[in-house]
Swiss-Prot record:
Protein name: Lysine--tRNA ligase
SUPFAM superfamilies (alphabetical): Class II aaRS and biotin synthetases, Nucleic acid-binding proteins
Binding-site positions, Mg(2+) 2: 423
Cofactor list: Mg(2+)
Gene source species: Xylella fastidiosa (strain M12)
InterPro entries associated with the record: Aa-tRNA-synt_II, aa-tRNA-synth_II, aa-tRNA-synth_II/BPL/LPL, Lys-tRNA-ligase_II, Lys-tRNA-ligase_II_N, Lys-tRNA-synth_II_C, NA-bd_OB-fold, NA-bd_OB_tRNA
Any GO CC annotation of this UniProt entry: cytosol
Gene Ontology BP, a term: lysyl-tRNA aminoacylation
């Protein structure tokens, strides 16, 4: 028999199964054999499978004649009772391997104890190796111990964890039963490690900056508010580390980066989570053109390092990170996708208002031409940018921390990287003129007083830092979660966060 229930019965029978397992645990407690902590694991499933993969060399006869023995531990994932000989599968962090369990090898008492184990229990086994008639490598078990009794049944193996919300809420179950989820999070770890390795090799210094700020800044976003009792002080969870990292550049740390969490009190979607991971870096004596080169090379090299290729499929689109990424001015992109809009109209507020009305784009009366241009870009261009594309030269109005262009007034030396219609990175030549920065902060304050929750606060200490002098600097922010989505082909940010934000269960 195989211990699995039809999906339709799982919910109905779960309480009964839990009660049955608790009864087994009670009996085990009476015997004093629960939750031991002295197991010595020496081998992993994937290593054993790889070492003895050659079927011609390692036949059942050669395996049983050899002196190879394994000591393994893992979760019991399947159990098939067949009289005096049974089969089972255990799973460890590396994979699965089959167990051959025979009463004449294991012993009658231990075999009887095995028969009452449940799928989900964690066990330790020892034994030699053999191969079944179907050619499957198996551990011929002669020692078996229960390490942890599982009181809740795992989802049915044929249907798995089909409730997406349950997968997110109970990630611990998802990781047990969904190999694809495990692989995503293993890749996530490798991606972050590859980013660090890439930057460290180029002499960037990894730093840590505060997670709680007196004044939220560094991004146009609504912050979470908290309170420090001892200091009697309202604080904000950071929306970005930017202003602290640039203070470090002022202090002479010319190449710095941070990979850490940001918090934004905004909506939840397939692309947004209130708590998310960002890579942010700054390099003195660098321009936004050089930062674009850096971002492009780092993303391409990370894909090659982790995936072994620069080609990925994301949400049905074939993405190639190998060729040079396209660079396209925002106003040119808007005009290309909206031929009725001329380049001259891109800085004409009244003309852009009429175009927004024609395109049925909702805007606020407080918007200047820069924010109106962005609104048209987001509605008509952004979703069309499938292959990697840098959208450059953003208006000053929407770029309060970026340096204004020397070539064209009203625009900045800024870029955003889009892949498959999603923003992956943002960067610019940093504004290092303290008087200009103070003026832009003041405009942000006026916007906030006018009802813009995402406008920035005035940070007087940051202005003071700039007054000591900051070298010409290029900065970059990469959404790590979205980069992981790209490199794992995931369509929702929740699929790449171990514990995404969810409403509390009722």
């Amino acid at each position: 028999m195989t211990e699995h229930l039809p999906a339709s019965q799982v919910s109905f029978d779960e309480n009964a199964l839990i009660a049955e397992r608790r009864a087994k645990l009670l009996a085990l407690r009476a015997q004093g054999v629960v939750y031991p902590n002295d197991v010595k694991r020496e081998h992993y499933a994937a290593d054993v499978q790889a070492a003895f993969a050659n079927v011609e060399t390692w036949t059942a006869e050669t395996l049983e004649a050899s002196s190879h023995r394994v000591r393994m531990a893992g979760r019991l994932m399947a159990k098939r009772l067949m009289g005096k000989a049974s089969f089972a599968q255990i799973q460890d962090e590396s994979g699965r391997i089959q167990l051959l369990i025979q009463s004449n090898v294991l012993g009658e008492d231990s075999y009887a104890a095995f028969k009452v184990l449940d799928v989900g229990d964690i066990i330790a086994v020892e034994g030699g190796l053999t191969r079944t008639r179907t050619g499957e490598l198996s551990v011929k078990v002669n020692v078996l111990r229960l390490l942890t009794k599982a009181l809740r049944p795992l989802p049915d193996k044929w249907h798995g964890l089909t409730d997406v919300e349950q997968r997110y809420r109970q990630r611990y179950v998802d990781l047990i039963v969904t190999p694809e989820s495990r692989e995503i999070f293993i890749k996530r770890s490798k991606i972050i490690r590859a980013l660090r390795t890439w930057l460290d090799a180029r002499l960037f210094l990894e730093v840590e900056t505060p997670m709680m700020h007196y004044i939220p800044g560094g991004a146009a976003a609504k912050p979470f508010v908290t309170y420090h009792n001892a200091l009697d002080l309202e604080l904000y969870l950071r929306v970005a580390p930017e202003l602290y990292l640039k203070r470090l550049v002022v202090g002479g740390l010319e190449r710095v980066y941070e990979i850490n969490r940001n918090f934004r009190n905004e909506g939840v979607s397939t692309r947004h989570n209130p708590e998310f991971t960002m890579l942010e870096l700054y390099e003195a004596y660098s321009t936004y053109h050089e930062v674009m080169d850096l971002a492009e090379t780092m993303i391409r090299d990370t894909a090659q390092s982790v995936l072994g290729t620069t080609q990925v499929i994301w949400d049905g689109a074939q993405i190639d990170l190998g060729p040079i990424f396209r660079r396209w001015r925002m106003d040119e992109a808007v005009c290309h996708h909206n031929p009725e809009i001329s380049v001259a109209e891109c800085t004409d507020r009244d003309a852009l208002l009429l175009h927004c009305e024609r395109l049925k784009i909702k805007v606020k009366s407080s918007y200047g031409w820069g924010r109106l241009l962005l609104s048209i870009f987001e509605a008509t261009v952004e979703h069309t940018l499938i292959q990697p594309t840098f959208i450059t030269d953003h208006p000053v109005e929407i770029s309060p921390l970026a340096r204004e262009s020397d070539i064209e007034s009203g625009y900045t030396d800024r870029f955003e990287l889009f892949i498959n219609g999603k923003e992956i990175a943002n960067g610019f030549s940093e504004l290092n003129d303290p008087e200009e920065q103070a003026m832009r902060f003041q405009k942000q304050v006026e916007a906030k007083e006018g009802g813009d929750d995402e406008a920035m606060y005035y940070d007087a200490d940051y202005i003071r830092a700039l007054e000591y002098g900051m070298a010409p600097t290029g900065g970059l922010g990469i959404g790590v979660d979205r980069l992981v989505m790209l490199l794992t082909g995931s369509t929702s940010i929740r699929d790449v966060l171990l514990f995404p934000y969810m409403r509390p269960e009722r």
